[in-house]
């Protein structure tokens, strides 16, 4: 790779991600095209594919960032020495809160759980967190056990996120 190419790619990636976030929030993930993202970033549509293989690859990058921030925010809110059960309760609550803020954010969460690469990342990362939080308490559990618990939990969260709670009228 020629000298100076790395910063150029990083700048393009950053511009594409910023444009994508703006468009995803305005139009939703499904309705936003790669052409629209490239245009909003002030680049050609071919420039998009020089940075990301497809729109799902961009979603994966964004999903990784979102979940890293979400975990960091949860830990910061709880402070030092938090109980693992508290983290396990608060983190999905933050997800639900974010998803309830707007239809576009909710759709972005649902999309993240709907595509193979992003869903796999979420499940693997959440499994790692479960092992970190509860592995010492449950030494008899394997990573596979924690993975299956993650699948069950994320299924419930995704089901709740699929429909805006305001549509449930009592």
Regions inferred by a protein language model and the residue ranges of each:
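Catalytic or ion-translocation cores adjacent to nucleophile or general acid/base/metal-coordination motifs
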Residues: 12
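N-terminal intrinsically disordered/low-complexity leader segments
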Residues: 1-8
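Helix-turn-helix
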Residues: 15, 23-57, 61
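Amphipathic alpha-helical packing segments from all-alpha helical-bundle domains
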Residues: 113-162
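Hydrophobic alpha-helical connector segments
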Residues: 61, 72-105, 115, 125
